[in-house]
Amino acid sequence: MKMSWESLKKWPPNVFALTSSLLAESGAYRLAVSPPKGKVWPRNPDFWTAELPDIANKVRAYAVGRDSAPPAFRKCWESLEKGKGLGVDSLVKPRQWKTCESILYLHAIADEACRGLGVPTGWPMSTAAEVDFSIRAYYLLSRHGTLANINPDLVRVLPKLHTPQVGATLRSFSHHLTTTASEVSINWQLVPSGLRPDRETINVMLFPFPYEIRPTDFKGVGESSFFQFSSAQSLNVGRIVRLIEEGRSRVGAIDMIVFPEASLSCRDLSRLQGRLRKEVQMPIILAGVRKPPSGGTLGSNYAEFIVRISERALYSGKQYKHHRWCLDDVQIRQYHLGSALDPNHHWWEGIQIERRELNFIPLTDAITICPLICEDLARQEPVAEVVRAVGPTLVIALLLDGPQMAARWPSRYATVLADDPGSSVLTLTSLGMALRSRPQGKEPARLVALWKDRKTGLLEIELPPRKEAIILTVCREWREEWTADYRGDGGSAATPFLAGIEPIGLD
C-alpha cells in the first residue's frame, strides 16, 4: 500500500510511523542523547515547554483541515523531503545532522499532537479541531486497531501509556505514541464501563475458583500427547452473588470481578452474567474460560471481558491464549498428577491456537487493563513486544498455576514489566491449583495472587481459611515521566497501586 508524502504529512500518527521507521532502521534516535560533535539536541533548551505544545495544537488543527501547517512543522518536513534520496544508514553521519534533526523534531511533534488518545477523557478538548481530531483517531483505533491509516500489516501506531525510565531504545523517546510491526492484532475499545473517568480508586474482587482441583480434572485426549483440563467443581452462581453482596457491605462498590485461567465453563459464565446483568451496578467481569473439544477440533482457552453498557446491552470481548502449556515430568510430580497423566511423556494443552490478539481496556483515565493468560506472561513472542511498547497501566495475568510466591516465575516476569515499561501487574491462580503444588519438602500455600507496582513493590496475596474471595482496593498515583531527551509528560503517567486487601467469606 503506497501513500503520497502529502498524505503522510497530514496525519500525525502517519508522521510518527515514518519517523519511527527511519530512526529505528538507522539507529539515529541515539543521536538525541549523543549528538555529533559541536551539535546540541534540542537546539533550544526551552523548546519542549515553550514551543512544542503550541506547534502540536496547530498540527492537530491542520490534520483535520481547520488550519494550515505551522511553520516549524513545515520547515522540518521540507528538510525531510530533501533527504529522500539518502540511504537510511547515512542519517547517523555528522554531515546529515540537519536531516536527522528534522526527523527528531517531527517525531516529537507527532507524539505531542496525539497526547491523551486511548483513554476515556484524554486531553481536554477545548476547540472544534481537537474534537474532530479525537473522533477521527478513535474511529481508526476502534475499527482497525491502529491510529494510522497505513496498512496495519506493515505497522501499527498505538496509544502509549508509559515511557521507560531506564535504558535508551526508540521507546524511550515518546510519551503518547508507539509503533509495532507484528502479527498481533489489537482490540482497543473505549467501552462505557460505568466508572467515572477521574475515579481515584476501584475495587477488584478476586475469586480463586475452583477451590479444589483433582487429578481426574486432567485427562489425555485419545492417543495423542494432548491433555484437557476441566474442573469437576461447578460454579455456585448464587453463592458468588452473595459474596459480592458481602463485599459491598464491607468496601462499598465492587467494580470488577476476576476469575483465573480456565476456571469457568462457557455455561458457568453465561449463568453468571445472566444473573448479574439484572443489577444496576453489575460489576465488570474478567474471566478465564475453557471450551471443550468439539467435532474433531481441540478446545479453547480464553479470557472474556464483559461490561454492562445499558439495561439491554452487554459488551463482550475475547482474547485467546497464545501458547500451549506443556506438562513435563517435573510439573506432573509437582502437582501430583501421575494418576492421570504418565510422567514419562510430555503432555501439551489441547487447545486451538487462534489468531494472536491483544485487548487494551480503558476503565478510567488512570487504569487501562491488558489481560494475559499464563504462558503469555512468560513467553517473549509474540505479545511481549506489544505490551512493552504500549505500557498498559495494569496487566492482569490469569493463571492455572501453583502458589504465587515471590520466588516463582510469575514474580520474575511481573518485575520485568514493572521496571520497563512501568506497568503494575496482578496475577491470579485458583486455590485448587495452588494447593496441588506440593514440591518435595514444601508445605501447601494458599497464595493465590501476586501484585507488583513501582510505588509499593511486590506483595504476595493469601486467601485465608474459610474465605472464598479477596477484594483489592486499587488507587492511582500520577507521575511525571521523561523521555531520554528530557521531555516531560506533565505528570500524565498513572501508576495503579495497592491500597487495601479485604478477604471475603460467608461465615
Question: What name fits each language-model region?
Answer:
Residues 201-229, 367-376, 396:
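Active-site-proximal beta-strand elements of phosphoester/diester hydrolases
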Residues 469-507:
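A short C-terminal boundary segment appended to hydrolase-like catalytic domains
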Residues 175-198, 298-389:
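Active-site catalytic loop in hydrolytic enzyme cores
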Residues 232-236, 261-263, 347-350, 371-376, ...:
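Short, flexible loop segments at the rims of nucleotide/cofactor-binding pockets, characterized by
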Residues 31-212, 260:
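Long, charge-dense tracts
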Residues 234-321, 410-415, 419:
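Cys-nucleophile CN-hydrolase/nitrilase-fold catalytic domain and related Cys-dependent amidase chemistry
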Residues 2-108, 255, 269-287, 374-483:
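CN hydrolase (nitrilase-like) catalytic-core segments centered on the catalytic cysteine
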Residues 209, 308, 430:
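Cofactor-binding loop segments of dinucleotide-utilizing enzymes, especially the Rossmann-like FAD-
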